[in-house]
UniProtKB/Swiss-Prot annotation:
One of the Pfam families matching this protein, by short name: IPPT
Uppermost EC category: transferase
Subunit structure: Monomer.
Cofactor(s) listed in the protein's UniProt record: Mg(2+)
Residue(s) at site: Interaction with substrate tRNA: 105, 127
Signal peptide stretch: none
Protein name: tRNA dimethylallyltransferase
Length: 327
């Protein structure tokens, strides 16, 4: 079988506060790279301090992609991310540079590296109608309906799982095809690059927790709450009926800050809630990352030499690329 001749890229994955940004910058400077953000908070304008967005100096030193794509009252889907990321990667490769995918949003990584199924978008009216029917006949009755229109999905979905029953019926009603049809379609196109997956994660949970606390305190000292107040004051945000439903506001830290500024609890209670929410996010991220069986794990502090050897072994000597691109 012929060797994979696709250009190389690296994916720097890991829980929040694990050091991905610093490593991405180091790798970009050493191997002539450009950074593609894989972070669902960094796509929103105005989310700076609380999202740990790369500052102007970092962006001047290394080109960054997929930052500040939407306003905080707008929505940005994983499918949109995958399309934008593919375009950015192709442009980086065309310049003879190394794409460095850095972030911790698992859904974005899956959409890009594995592809998404072609499921229709959610439909609020259809969901409301199904919920009203459930109130009348129960979810078991709706499961029976699902068994008639999509026996394959009904066999996988338990009669006591209302969320999945609702979604399966919603897809059928708005598309005319069962959800099992959509899920059987090929998920997406092959990436034009060969990717080394690197996971940065401290071996000891206490170390990661300490990093999370220190980072939040630094954000507060830099004016995080004032930043959230500025976002809240935007006319478009004030016009939103339920701001806490917006993806930008649901970002970890921002939701807790929003609730605090709404008058929920003391500053100390906000800090505790934000730290706890960030720890829970890190736990979810680690659970997802353990499923990435082809990824290589490194402790960001203990495994520096092993990490460097892994990167050098994969990337080799890219000095010729630097010379060709004039960098």
């Amino acid at each position: 079988m012929p060797a994979d001749q696709r250009p190389l890229a690296i994916a720097l994955m890991g829980p929040t506060a694990s050091g991905k940004t610093a490593l991405a910058l180091e790798a970009a400077e050493r191997w002539n790279g450009e950074i593609v953000s894989v972070d669902s908070a960094l796509v929103y304008r105005g989310l700076e301090i609380g999202a740990a967005k790369p500052d102007a100096a970092m962006r001047a030193a290394v080109p960054h992609h997929l930052l500040d794509l939407r306003d905080p009252w707008q929505v940005y889907s994983a499918a949109e991310f995958a399309g934008d990321a593919r375009q950015a990667i192709a442009q980086i490769v065309a310049r003879g540079k190394l794409p460095i995918l850095a972030g911790g949003t698992g859904l974005y990584f899956r959409a890009l590296l594995e592809g998404l199924s072609h499921l229709p978008e959610a439909d609020r009216a259809a969901r409301a109608s199904i919920a009203a029917e459930a109130a009348q006949i129960g979810w078991a009755g709706l499961h029976s309906e699902l068994a008639r229109v999509d026996p394959v999905a009904a066999a996988r979905i338990h009669a006591t799982d209302p969320q999945r029953i609702q979604r399966a019926l919603e897809v059928y009603r708005i598309s005319g095809r069962p959800i099992s049809y959509w899920q059987a379609l090929p998920p997406g196109l092959r990436l034009p690059v060969r990717v080394l997956k690197v996971v940065l994660a401290p071996r000891e949970r206490a170390v990661l927790h300490g990093r999370i606390e220190r980072r939040l305190d630094a954000m507060l000292a830099q004016g995080f709450l004032a930043e959230v107040e500025q976002v809240r004051a935007l006319p478009q945000m004030r016009a939103v009926a339920v701001p806490l439903d917006l993806p930008a506001v649901r970002a970890v830290g921002y939701r807790q800050a929003w609730e605090y500024l709404d008058g929920a609890g003391s500053l100390a209670e906000f800090r505790d809630k934000a730290i706890q929410a960030t720890r829970q996010l890190a736990k979810r991220q680690l659970t997802w990352l353990r499923g990435e069986l082809d990824a290589r794990w490194f402790d960001p502090e203990r495994d520096r030499h092993q990490l460097e050897r892994a990167l050098v072994g994969f990337l080799g000597d890219r000095s010729a690329v630097r010379q060709a691109s004039g960098v």
